[in-house]
Amino acid sequence: MLRGNEAEGVVVAGRKSEDEVSLVPLLPIAAQGGSLNDFVVSVKENDCERVVSPIRGADFAMPVAGDSMAPEYPAGSQIFIKKINERAFIDWGKVYVLDTCNGSVIKRVFPSDNAEKVKCVSINPEYPPFEVSYEDIYGMYRVLLCMSVK
């Protein structure tokens, strides 16, 4: 995912001045709603288009691909995410994007029986849960908002 400087995403409701609107990088890779693949992508911030964040605190936006997180996070929707320190605190049961050595994936995250891993669970029951080792996670991003066309 994003390597280098990270933008701050703060939007002040009701403000129309361009100086007061928050633009966040739209990552040119999708969070896979499925299982991890073997594709590693490194993105530089200046390679990213910027989009207006409709929510305070978002660091990045990215598209969702696949249907494992449908219907809440359908393919083609755009999510706004915030980087967290996964070593300090994880809000178990919430949806995160995990940037891993095998690609980026969007999943509901739970503790694993193995203290060195997290359990990733899809909303769509057709997709089985899987585990990811902390050492394979480059970053965890809490999903703050999902926008989709209805």
Where are these regions (language model features)?
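Short, positionally conserved secondary-structure boundary motifs
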Residues: 1-75, 85-88, 147-150
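Acidic/glycine-rich C-terminal interaction modules and beta/coil loop segments
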Residues: 55-150
